[in-house]
Curated annotation (Swiss-Prot):
<keyword id="KW-0560">Oxidoreductase</keyword>
<feature type="domain" description="FAD-binding PCMH-type">
    <location>
        <begin position="54"/>
        <end position="268"/>
    </location>
</feature>
<comment type="function">
    <text>Catalyzes the azurin dependent hydroxylation of the methyl group of 4-methylphenol to form 4-hydroxybenzaldehyde.</text>
</comment>
<dbReference type="InterPro" id="IPR004113">
    <property type="entry name" value="FAD-bd_oxidored_4_C"/>
</dbReference>
<comment type="subunit">
    <text>Tetramer of two cytochrome subunits and two flavoprotein subunits.</text>
</comment>
<keyword id="KW-0274">FAD</keyword>
<dbReference type="GO" id="GO:0018695">
    <property type="term" value="F:4-cresol dehydrogenase (hydroxylating) activity"/>
</dbReference>
<protein>
    <recommendedName>
        <fullName>4-cresol dehydrogenase [hydroxylating] flavoprotein subunit</fullName>
        <ecNumber>1.17.9.1</ecNumber>
    </recommendedName>
</protein>
<dbReference type="InterPro" id="IPR016170">
    <property type="entry name" value="Cytok_DH_C_sf"/>
</dbReference>
<dbReference type="InterPro" id="IPR016164">
    <property type="entry name" value="FAD-linked_Oxase-like_C"/>
</dbReference>
<dbReference type="InterPro" id="IPR016171">
    <property type="entry name" value="Vanillyl_alc_oxidase_C-sub2"/>
</dbReference>
<dbReference type="InterPro" id="IPR016169">
    <property type="entry name" value="FAD-bd_PCMH_sub2"/>
</dbReference>
<dbReference type="GO" id="GO:1903457">
    <property type="term" value="P:lactate catabolic process"/>
</dbReference>
<dbReference type="Pfam" id="PF01565">
    <property type="entry name" value="FAD_binding_4"/>
</dbReference>
<dbReference type="InterPro" id="IPR016166">
    <property type="entry name" value="FAD-bd_PCMH"/>
</dbReference>
<comment type="pathway">
    <text>Aromatic compound metabolism; p-cresol degradation.</text>
</comment>
<dbReference type="GO" id="GO:0008720">
    <property type="term" value="F:D-lactate dehydrogenase activity"/>
</dbReference>
Length: 521
């Protein structure tokens, strides 16, 4: 069998050195867990970014099933200076999928490390391996009738909690800030040591998934969106399943209402009257997630005209902004908070409140209610069919939870997107003080001209938002080095100093978040 994927090699590695490493991978993992042929590597090179697949082609993929095997892979990589790109389930759609950040890196696939090690229904936590999916966890909870619920991103069933948390993804329940709910990591370092964060270093400790901090420096965050180690176990807290769950939607007809919506909502989030991550979705986000397509309304090139969007609102009952939230607790708690919430929106004098009883099984209400109650689904994949063609990049700047800021960001984004003939497909995810302004830059990747426009558009979005003091909190692998520049040279110098200390051979995902010892820092 050839040890070569069409001459795709790791940067700076000779064919001979690569072949030696592959032989050692085979001895360690078995032939079935070492993939080098082009057709075997296709699943690891399905990107949605505006570049050729070849730019992110792996040279090989290896699958580990134990921590000891991960340690062995790291040892081989150090011996032969082989860079590896680690994935858990590889479902990071819109952010790079499973493909490596740099051409030629070897994929370390942890999908076969898929044990649910423990779920404690009394202390409400889980400890899992990286290959565990949200769908797998949900099934386990249901089969064992456990009184806990999950929080996850959307679409959720095939993604996993470890990968999502390591990328600092968010969900839609009261536990929606996933990294905040993480408690205890096991990490294989570049030298092969196995490090446990928090209380995990104490022999016999039963508080590893209970108390986040441990003693001395708290290093969990150092391993997220970074390349300082390989997470092989993660603990996280689970929300006790409430006796009453009341989802609702508030539909607003006017795009200008965003200022009043956010300013009315913020006190409800700060006081925890509404405890979950609230969503305010644009019309086109609603349309895509309801599995409508642009072609049903217009075949004209360019962005979708406002007149067409207005017609869509009229036809479907969707708003210019569509707010989704939920109440949780005892019946008494929910009743009290429901009166507070409805009084706020009645005082606002705009917005039509829709309850679950009124919405029934209609989409997108149904899948939103599922997301807010910990039921995984794949409904939001419909966004990718809005325009079609397989192109998607998430542009995710952070804003204050202040109406004027949201209005400003929405206007900026629309202006740039429309300049390049693309649609504003967006949602705000509302925390007590901040908002994630998540925009899906959708384009036809089979159209070279449109792909070129999408690339220019994303660059301009980064530039224009940075001029106003905004930066994204997460980005696809094509733009990670560019976004790292937004945060200034001191941060980058420190990140590279840490990299030199913990990974002097630069084997762990060089280029992740712009951290690469080949950079001049």
């Amino acid at each position: 069998m050839s040890e070569q994927n069409n001459a795709v090699l790791p940067k700076g590695v000779t064919q001979g050195e690569f072949n030696k490493a592959v032989q050692k991978f085979r001895a360690l993992l078995g032939d079935d867990n070492v993939l080098v042929e082009s057709d075997q590597l296709v699943p690891y090179n399905k990107i949605m970014m505006p570049v050729e697949n070849a730019a992110h082609a792996p040279s090989a993929a290896v699958t580990a099933t134990t921590v000891e095997q991960v340690q062995g892979v790291v040892k081989i990589c150090n011996e032969h200076k082989i860079p590896i790109w680690t994935i858990s389930t590889g479902r990071n759609f819109g952010y790079g999928s499973a493909a490596p950040v740099q051409r030629g890196q070897v994929i370390l696939d942890l999908k076969k490390m898929n044990k649910i090690i423990k779920i404690d229904p009394e202390m409400c936590y889980a400890l899992v391996e990286p290959g565990v999916t949200f769908g797998q966890m949900y099934d386990y909870i249901q089969e064992n009738n456990l009184p806990v619920m999950l929080s996850f991103s959307a679409p959720s069933a095939i993604a996993g909690p470890v990968g999502n948390t390591m990328d600092r993804g968010v969900g839609y329940t009261p536990y929606g800030e996933h990294f905040m709910m993480q408690c205890g990591m096991e990490v294989v370092l570049a030298n092969g040591d196995v490090y446990r964060t928090g209380m995990g270093g104490v022999p016999g400790s039963n508080t590893w998934q209970i108390f986040k901090w441990g003693y001395g420096p708290t290093l969990d965050g150092m391993f997220t969106q970074a390349n300082y180690g390989i997470c092989t176990k993660m603990g996280f807290w689970l929300m006790p399943k409430p006796p009453v769950f009341k989802p609702f939607e508030v539909i607003f007809e006017d795009e200008a209402d965003i200022v009043e919506i956010v300013d009315a909502l913020r006190p409800l989030r700060m006081s925890n009257t509404i405890p979950n991550s609230v969503v305010i979705a644009s019309t086109l986000w609603e349309a895509g997630s309801a599995h409508l397509t642009r072609a049903q309304y217009t075949t004209e090139p360019g962005h979708t005209p406002d007149s067409v969007i207005k017609q869509m609102q009229k036809d479907t009952g969707m708003g210019a902004w569509n707010l989704y939230a939920a109440l949780y607790g005892t019946q008494e708690q929910v009743d009290v908070n429901w009166k507070i919430v409805t009084d706020v929106f009645k005082k606002l004098g705009k917005g039509r409140i829709v309850t679950q009883e009124e919405a029934g099984d209609t989409q997108p209400f149904k899948y939103r209610a599922q997301l807010m109650s910990g039921v995984p689904n794949l409904q939001e994949f419909g966004l990718y069919n809005w325009r079609g063609g397989g192109g998607s990049m998430w542009f995710a700047p952070v804003s204050e939870a202040r109406g004027s800021e949201c209005k400003k960001q929405a206007a900026m984004a629309k202006r740039v997107l429309h300049k390049y003939g693309l649609d504003y497909v967006a949602e705000f995810i509302v925390a007590p003080r901040d908002m994630h302004h998540v925009i899906d830059v959708l384009y036809d990747r089979t159209n070279p001209e449109e792909t070129k426009r999408a690339d220019a558009c994303f660059n301009e979005l980064l530039d224009e938002f940075e001029k106003e003091g905004y930066a994204v909190y997460r980005v696809n692998t094509r733009f990670q080095d560019r976004v790292a520049q937004s945060y200034g040279p001191v941060k980058r110098k420190l990140e590279h100093a840490i990299k030199r200390a913990v990974d002097p051979n630069n084997i762990l995902a060089p280029g992740r978040s712009g951290i690469d010892l080949n950079n001049d820092f």
